[in-house]
Amino acid sequence: MDIDKKQILDPSFKDKNNNSFQVMMDWEKPYMEKCIQTLNPFGDVLEIGFGMGYSATAINKYPIRSYTVIEKDKDVIKKFNKWKLKQKTKKINLIEGLWQIKIPLINKKFDCIFFDDSPAPEINVRSPRHTLFVKLILLKIVKHNTRLVSYSTSATPCNISWSSSDTYNKHINNSVICTSNKFKIKIPYFCRYAKGNYMYVNKIVFKK
């Protein structure tokens, strides 16, 4: 990854115009902080993707018991390790790798989860990433009243694509409460992954 104070770029992953993939930009900071305010972290917290550390910093301002992040990128992990040195009062854990591989190996349940990953070209699955993520955490790491807030450019609280034959279909419909709130923010014209003047704070509460 190419990381500076303004953005994170992934030169190994090109778009159709051969531009380095935009992973994250500094304009997102107030939106990320709003996401964490909505999550209202407590207990054991899991984050998917460390990014520029905006959400991690916000999470660790709350009286949580532990903070765990799953992160795949070596350069972002270096940034995480520097950040961790400043966080002396919390139990902080790093799981290095792809969440698609690591979540099935976790033997712990979490109270709060924040999901803001980036595409992983090395993972070849047909399901949308968020759908796959919810399936995996339902099996392994959520408990009654676990809260999930997800980064989103659209007002789709659950953002889950279940087929009519999917065994999760009935279960998910009966076991979650979904909400979505619009967040006004100026998105720069050169951002390729979000457009307009709004982002969305999408929240799921699991009632399993």
Predicted regions and their residues:
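A generic alpha-to-beta junction signature in SAM-dependent methyltransferases
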Residues: 39-40, 63, 140-144
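A short acidic, Gly/Pro-enriched loop at the edge of an enzyme's catalytic core
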Residues: 104-117
